[in-house]
Structure formats: C-alpha cells, structure tokens
Regions:
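Conserved beta-loop-beta element that borders a ligand/cofactor-binding pocket
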Residues: 109, 161-173
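Conserved internal alpha-helix in NAD(P)-dependent oxidoreductase domains
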Residues: 80, 84-91, 99, 103, ...
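Conserved glycine-rich Rossmann-like NAD(P)H-binding loop of the short-chain dehydrogenase/reductase
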Residues: 27-38
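SDR active-site strand-loop-helix element
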Residues: 9, 32, 69-70, 105-111
Length: 173
C-alpha cells in the first residue's frame, strides 16, 4: 500500500525537525522552504517562498496533506515583519492547497494566540510561580480560551486559526 503524500513547510525548523523522523516512517514526506531541506531527495525538496503563490502550487500538486509550520516566529516582530510570511504567505498556503486538491492542511499555531491572557489572574501568578495567590481550582486554558494575542506574532497565529476555519467550512480542507 502506498504511503500518503505529506508536505511540511518549515521542516528544518524546531517543530519540523522534531516530527520529521516519525513522518518519514509513516508518509512519503516532502518539504517546502526557502533554502531546501537537508537530506531530502531533490524531487521532494521544494524550494520557494511563501509569498510566491506559484511556487506553492507547484509544490502542492499531488499532495494529500500539507503541514504548515513555516513562519516568522519572532515574538517581538512588528506588523511589517509578520505581514509577508505569517499573513499573506499563510493565505497563499491555503489557497494553493485548495487549487491543488489537497485534502487536509494542518496549521501549526502557538500559545501566543492566547498569550495575552497571561496578564490576568490567575495565569499571571502561575507564570510568576506565585502559587500562594492562586485560588484552586482555576480554569485551565484550552481550545475555548478567548483569543487574546501577545503581540503581532500572536495575531498572525490567531489569524491562521481563523483562516483554517474558513477553508475547512467552505472548501472542505
């Protein structure tokens, strides 16, 4: 039985490097990055830029799943830094996936999409290891926690979650 074709953007990054061994066992793995990915067969080592829609379309052809991890991950980035890769690039990923018939896009979000909640109690005290001021039990953060980004990087991750929802609901990805 043939393996599902899975392409990962940002395979050389921290998360990509961590998942690569398992993904190589289970899937026919491809990568997409600006500089290429170490030790990846050339036909599955797609070089391009998230801002370049056409390079994404070329890479996504015949892929079953795209795992989107590539981003500018600077927590202190300003809007002009985040916009090209984390906003425009992300939309390009989803649109290319739609056009190419990709069945699933997995978006790598971040706790920074809700990180502004750490400014409020009880989370502030927990983060400062000041447990004497924490009333137990308290509600843990989960998928129902209010979106409250901590900086423009967090905004871009919250945006990515919303874009993923749109493409899931209206395009079946």
């Amino acid at each position: 039985m043939s393996k599902k074709k899975v392409l990962v953007t940002g395979l050389n990054g921290v998360v990509g490097s961590a998942i690569r061994p398992l993904f190589e066992e289970k899937y026919e793995l491809s990568s997409f990055s600006r500089y290429g990915c170490d030790d990846m067969p050339e036909e599955r080592n797609h070089k391009g830029d998230l801002k370049d829609y056409d390079s994404l379309v070329k890479a996504f052809k015949d892929q079953h799943t795209v795992v989107h991890l590539a981003a500018d991950r600077s927590m202190r980035a300003d809007w002009d830094t985040v916009l090209p890769y984390n906003i425009i690039g992300l939309r390009n990923v989803y649109e290319a996936a739609k056009v190419c018939g990709v069945k699933r896009v997995v978006f790598g979000s971040s706790q920074h999409s809700i990180g502004g909640n750490y400014d409020d109690e009880p989370y502030k005290s927990v983060m400062e290891s000041d447990f004497e001021n924490v009333e137990y039990p308290f509600k843990r953060m989960d998928e129902t926690t209010r979106i409250r980004p901590s900086g423009w990087y967090g905004v871009s991750k919250a945006f990515g979650e919303a874009v993923g929802s749109i493409y899931s609901q209206y395009h079946g990805i």
